[in-house]
Amino acid sequence: MDVRRRPVTKTLTAGEPLKSQNQHSSSLKASDALPLPLYLTNGLFFTMFFSVMYFLLHRWREKIRNSVPLHVVTLSELAALVLLVASVIYLLGFFGIGFVQSLIRPSPDSWDILEDDNAILEEDSRCEPCAAAIDCSLPPNLKIARMVPQKHKSAFADVVEEQKQSASATIIDEDEEIINAVVAGTTPSYSLESKLGDCLKAAAIRREALQRITGKSLDGLPLDGFDYESILGQCCEMPVGYVQVPVGIAGPLLLNETEYSVPMATTEGCLVASTNRGCKAIYASGGATSVLLKDGMTRAPVVRFGSAKRAAELKFFLEDPMNFETLALVFNKSSRFGRLQGIKCAIAGKNLYMRFTCSTGDAMGMNMVSKGVQNVLDFLQNDFPDMDVMGISGNYCSDKKPAAVNWIEGRGKSVVCEAIIKEEVVKKVLKTNVAALVELNMLKNLAGSAVAGALGGFNAHASNIVSAVYVAAGQDPAQNIESSHCITMMEAVNDGKDLHISVTMPSIEVGTVGGGTQLASQSACLNLLGVKGASKESPGPNSRLLASIVAGSVLAGELSLMSALAAGQLVKSHMKFNRSSKDVSKLSS
């Protein structure tokens, strides 16, 4: 295994002239010419720079206030300017030259590198890039072999082989040391990426340590073939591998006169096939149409006052149209795309819940709206100093949980999608009839859901399609809860011959930038739908189109499942496509 190496000295035999060269080169330093120790000299010039800068800015402000010409300079100001220039020259000379030299390096002869121990140590101690291959055939210090001219390759081969064998033993030993440290608890597992500088190596070491601690094998969990650098600090902490979920394609879905191939990541048999059948029925009937009703993400902080009267005063202030422009100005400065749309308040005793709604461009927008809300809370603190902010989220938002406020007011994208399915398509493709579908929809999705006390669940299986598309497209799977709020309506039209079907989904929460959308697999699925990344024309159309595609896919899934139920095909199809025959055979044996 490849690990981050310490400066390798064991690969060089003792007594070689490299050591003497290293000692000679390090005997004299530029800092030896300074009258004070290096840290004191640096501290002195830093203090001088900031002190003189503060003095000059203070004098400049006084001159502007007193209408004194800026070119009139006193003796103290002249001395301050001289000290400022001197400190700038020193700091640039001390820090700037070294930085420039690190960017523009000469190309030394390859044989000079072989005779320079410092060059070998510098290359060997350099951190390998994140997600580099975990099995490395050559250690970093052997990369210099590539720079050796062809005529010297034979003379260099023996040195390469000797160093390779020595380094391999060191790598294994260091890997074992790190694993033992993680198992013993002396090295925190979460710090491996920062300590090693190699995300793939960190995942491999963490994985091995976990297996030793638990005594359980992770052989079936893949490790290689994933870009762990892409999730660092963004998608997942302390990774030990990745889970594989198959992706199927349903479609083409003909929506708003455009065809889409819908990626669905699922482990449920029949789901993709059923949705695909619904897409076929919609396509054969002329396609579906969707309309975006609302587009606004919400966040609702909770604050507390000493009395209900004070809480009501803030409520009236926030809901007063005269104050909206000021609040929007404060809110909008947190982002180029976040624009405040409205504030709705609710009181519970002396506690006030403020539900902010804002547009978020092509992002799902939770972080964006949270930053804007924080700006408004800081602003309100000036006029309401007795306001005690209890939490940036008070569950009046409401995120990742079923809530009537989302069902009624909406959250994210509110979409309605409809289609008229022709009578012959219902019979030939869906294997049922219009009257049976309409009656079953009333009994199951409307009356049955009401009997169950459903909240936003007036549908057959909207969450099945939403979850599958969300996983494939890099959305937050937990937001499937409110995103699956859906009411499915069916009605006989054209003298009872054709079927009008619609789905109304008030809180589809999607984005095409940020989060899991930047991962390679999920990005490819978004690209398939034509909604990858942010729109170049204006903020928002990609995420709104993705929400419409989700609603159209749900429409297809609802149509197919309800037809299977009406025709009595559900059990038969699941026994054929959704059984684990391998597990059954094992149990029978």
Curated annotation (Swiss-Prot):
Biological pathway: Metabolic intermediate biosynthesis; (R)-mevalonate biosynthesis; (R)-mevalonate from acetyl-CoA: step 3/3
Listed GO CC annotations: endoplasmic reticulum membrane; peroxisomal membrane
Topological region Cytoplasmic: 57-79, 566-589
UniProt keyword Protein transport, yes or no: no
TM segment ranges: 36-56, 80-100, 545-565
PROSITE patterns: HMG_COA_REDUCTASE_1, HMG_COA_REDUCTASE_2, HMG_COA_REDUCTASE_3, HMG_COA_REDUCTASE_4
BP terms from Gene Ontology: coenzyme A metabolic process; isoprenoid biosynthetic process; sterol biosynthetic process
Catalytic activity: (R)-mevalonate + 2 NADP(+) + CoA = (3S)-3-hydroxy-3-methylglutaryl-CoA + 2 NADPH + 2 H(+)
Family matches, as CDD domains: HMG-CoA_reductase_classI
SUPFAM superfamilies according to UniProt: NAD-binding domain of HMG-CoA reductase, Substrate-binding domain of HMG-CoA reductase
Function noted in UniProt: Catalyzes the synthesis of mevalonate, the specific precursor of all isoprenoid compounds present in plants. Component of the triterpene saponins (e.g. ginsenosides or panaxosides) and phytosterols biosynthetic pathways. Promotes triterpenes accumulation in roots.
Family: Belongs to the HMG-CoA reductase family.
Listed name of the protein: 3-hydroxy-3-methylglutaryl coenzyme A reductase 2-B
Source organism of the structure: Panax ginseng (Korean ginseng)
